[in-house]
Amino acid sequence: MKAIVQDKYGSAEVLDARDIEKPQIGDDQVLIRVHAASVHLGDWVLMTGSPFVMRFATGLRRPKNQVPGTDVAGTVEGIGKDVERLRPGDEVFGWCAGAFAEYA
């Protein structure tokens, strides 16, 4: 799948469009086919790693999650075995890690 990938902290120059593996679905997770993702201040903070204290949660030397983006809207493609409230085909929006990709 296509995704925006970030291997290090910095400005927009650290972002790279690449093909990566589609995320695996955990037992209590949902796979979303992304139709839209927004960019906001929180994404900028996570991308730049500033203030430095944030890196204790997001990765000291480089981001733990290489695909940025948190706000997402799309269609449910798959569900884990413990998911009860959603079904494939449902349209959803919300917060997740890795929204800047074809699947999150």
Go through the PLM ranges and name each one.
Residues 15-16, 62:
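A short, acidic/glycine-rich surface segment
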Residues 21-39, 52-98:
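Glycine-rich beta-strand-centered segment in the early N-terminal region that forms part
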Residues 6, 47, 77-78:
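Short beta-strand-to-turn element immediately C-terminal to the catalytic PLP-Schiff-base lysine
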Residues 99-104:
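Short, Lys/Arg- and Gly-enriched loop/turn segments at beta-strand edges
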Residues 6-8, 95:
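A generic structural motif
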